[in-house]
């Protein structure tokens, strides 16, 4: 068994740019010779195959209860023990978990991201770095609108209704308060190259300390 992997947690509101930051860190650390993977909390939305579509479409994806957090924590702990996992895949158009899974191998660096990543103390306790990506509400909404239409088969009206009904209020109730747990706050998400440079250098320094 090798050294303990470095675990970096990145959170922020939907459309904040946290996944852009996460993927850029994976790319840079991989280019530098470290193995790095991205594990997304979104993959662990609960299976809803036992519910009719009329109920699935009402799911509040921005509430802590929408995630199978026990499985997420279990898989993260397994990766920390240098064990491979079978990561769930979420089928957004059908609002449930896909039948397929994705094999994920352990790595030197595990980057985890998600809107409610810091909400559970079991997850926070496993993170060596905790990063909050802080982006203006209007920018986050416009990014989410574009993403959900292009990638998830949503309608403009559906995205707007969901944002006003759950996304915005849940952000202020559950996401923004977890900013206090962050070691580092990154404004402007993936466009903040200075911050990404700093995060990359900090991760490299922590790897050397291992």
From Swiss-Prot:
GO BP terms: namely: CTP salvage; UMP salvage
Q: Which InterPro entries does this entry report, sorted A to Z? A: AAA+_ATPase, P-loop_NTPase, PRK/URK, Uridine_kinase, Uridine_kinase-like
Superkingdom of origin: Bacteria
EC class of the enzyme, as a word: transferase
Tagged with keyword Protein biosynthesis: no
Stated EC number for the protein is: 2.7.1.48
Cross-referenced Gene3D superfamilies = P-loop containing nucleotide triphosphate hydrolases (3.40.50.300)
Q: Where is this protein primarily located?
A: cytoplasm
Q: Which UniProt keywords apply?
A: ATP-binding, Cytoplasm, Kinase, Nucleotide-binding, Transferase
The record's comment on protein family reads:
Belongs to the uridine kinase family.
Protein name, entry field: Uridine kinase
């Amino acid at each position: 068994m090798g050294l303990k992997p470095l675990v970096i947690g990145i959170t922020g509101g939907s459309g904040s740019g946290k996944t852009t930051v996460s993927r850029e860190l994976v790319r840079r650390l991989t280019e530098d010779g470290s193995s790095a993977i991205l594990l997304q909390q979104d993959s662990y939305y609960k299976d809803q195959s036992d519910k009719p579509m009329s109920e699935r479409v009402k799911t509040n994806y921005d509430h802590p209860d929408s995630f199978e957090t026990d499985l997420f924590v279990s898989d993260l702990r397994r990766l920390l023990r240098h064990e491979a996992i079978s990561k769930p895949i979420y089928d957004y158009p059908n609002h449930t978990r896909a039948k397929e899974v994705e094999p994920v191998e352990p790595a030197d660096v595990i980057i985890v991201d998600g809107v409610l990543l810091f909400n559970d103390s079991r997850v926070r306790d496993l993170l060596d770095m905790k990063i909050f990506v802080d982006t203006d509400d209007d920018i986050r909404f416009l990014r989410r609108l574009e993403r959900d239409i292009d990638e998830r088969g949503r309608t403009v009206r559906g995205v707007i209704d969901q944002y006003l009904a759950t996304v915005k209020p849940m952000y202020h109730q559950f996401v923004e308060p977890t900013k206090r747990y962050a070691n580092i706050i990154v404004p402007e998400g993936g466009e903040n190259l200075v911050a990404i440079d700093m995060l990359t250098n900090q991760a490299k320094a922590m790897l050397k300390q291992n």
